């Protein structure tokens, strides 16, 4: 090739100066050092990554990713380099040997003389640099490539092109990339060829005629022909994009797309093919007239047909009757969206909530509300830390988790926090490399509290600045104090060391040089000692340090020479890194969208982090697109840095995978949860053996799997609009709902809550994830939505919506305002506010109770002037219909609401069988006991009346109803007298409540 690139004998020129040689040598040395350092860093990252994957049993994932990316880099990089290099070479090879003398050519002589000595190097360098850019870009397309290669059928077709949905999800993105790549290569090659032709006289811009040589015209015509042909392929693919593009009233095909944009794409496709043929013909005809006309026609058609004509159709055909025109398209969008987000089978029931509780419903309400979680996972975090932290270098998450355990035969909800290592709490003098990475290596244990239970004395102390009164009213299920072992009883004990967690250090070096070496890793202090014990990690997690080469690689990766210098690093050491559970799942399954909230569970004697993994796409035809972050942006959402695939905008979502990460060993296990999901099937084909079958999930693990919050939030966001199935109503926004704003966090959605609620059509309660809707841009309540969150249930994942009538049932914001402005509540809160305490409102819970809706909200108190203060559960507010009750406990609040005692107390005297006397006898005992006795007699009379009616004895039925009414009226009269005397049962103004500790009933 070099002889072809020689134009004239080279002039050796004057001898080079020694100074310039030294400068050149220094520059070359610096470049070599920089390249060597970057190469070593890159290699160290790849090498240690391979060690990490292999140690975790996912070496096949590393191999697949590495070779896929490598092949894409070299294949597409070589394609760009080859096409550009060949075109540069051809442009130079067929340069004109005679160049007419002109000012233009005389000016270009300087550039030709400068380029001539380095022509070959310049050609190779330009081709390689452009190839490297193209190859690097291709690496980012590995997901599309693997999906295209391993994609399968969805089993259904779109409504317009009758293509399997798999074509849009698996094939279309990769085909788009191939066409875009081809167009980019042709554009770069065209520019490169044109520059070379211009430099060497093949293109002469300042001559009046023959501005292009024959070779230049032929080469440029061929490149333009292929480019326009690629554009035709792009128009063909663009047709299919119409079913997943947004920007209109819906995502997907609209009337304008169907009647203007789609025909325009077909016409432009045909014009592009004709234009390409004209460019190819121009190789022989040597005239630019026909190609220029074709290119001009394509450009004008693109403007007229692609932009102006759709605008005319939209403005003059669609706008005057848009609802009717768009109705068929909206109908298809509704059907596709409900399918893509899996909300097509939501059970919607009309629900007309009662506004008052019946006289005989007190015990039923008490039973149904016994499992209401009063311990707010967000607010009690400080209480967890100050009471169970033990040392400043331990911490728990900002928002705690809720899970359920079988404790003493009862299904109980617990608020859980993992006691993780938080190195920011270490003393400044202890913060050296040895301590940070070999001594302070792990956390210890789980802290657990009953979600629905108060401390035994049933009161709280808020007058001590350190809040030591009753540990925030919390009843511990697992902690550091003696006797708090309910979780241990439920699980049979467990490995409590936490080496992998949400707050774990970047890396730790663990392991002893010999079995007789001293343990140096600091463990949780032992009972009765102020000093922590020591331990040594003996799990199989992550990579072994090994010999000098591995130590050098880790030293390079982390920029830390102590890997080579410290005596704590030995051949038996392991390096624990990539320790965040969600990050570990992302790394072994880089095709998953990972849930933002991993939660801990004790399973088979180990602490596991459970993480939900989703398959998402933005290519599901006709389904509505929305930002994933927007849909899950509630008041508890934290920035995690986790990615949403393929983009933040999605229009399809499935909880395809349940993943676990062992908090001690770091072992990651993926289980196929939705085995019918075609996207999961494609990834299992791409990475065989990495995802276990659903049947491999143990019973103990299954007990702790739950419906994921991110999925529920996405579904509730979409269902707020897509519960409307009539196209005209949908277009007009009739009956549109929205997720309410959190009353205490402006601009954020109210988060969903995990509650035990009545099962659909059953008598038992089920563990559910719940939320509410309000009408669009209004504040009253529209509906209550829940989903069965119990993975062991046959009804798992079944969503139920209780749709309220249009009357003004107050929504969360309105209820929060009613609580704050209620005279009795406001007066009581003002009293302890004046004493230096500050009220903090907990979760505002909504739950269906006794054919109505009850709001429950805990109120915490914290010392306003104390930095060490943490919220203490002080009051509970309840609302049913128009009535508000409050008290120190939920039972007290219900008593205050109902005007009766719901718990055990003084037993009423034996008054005989109902019906012995129509006039109720004078009751004895306390007023509350009298009321209970009267209501019990009334309930007995109602039962007797029902039995008489069943037997057809109308006379007895009427007599028993009279007795019941007399007892109810007497009870109401006593309640009114007690209220006027200012003695509400359970009033928080008392120093202590008379009711016993609140112990929840079995919930299932």
UniProtKB/Swiss-Prot annotation:
Pfam families: UPF0182. The chain crosses the membrane at residues 26-46, 71-91, 120-140, 183-203, 212-232, 261-281, 293-313. Its main location: membrane. It is found in: Cell membrane. One of its GO terms (cellular component) is extracellular region. This is UPF0182 protein Noca_1530. Keywords: Cell membrane, Membrane, Transmembrane, Transmembrane helix. Residues 1-20, 899-924, 974-1004 are annotated as: Disordered. Belongs to the UPF0182 family. Residues 903-916, 979-1004 have a biased composition (Low complexity). It is a multi-pass membrane protein.
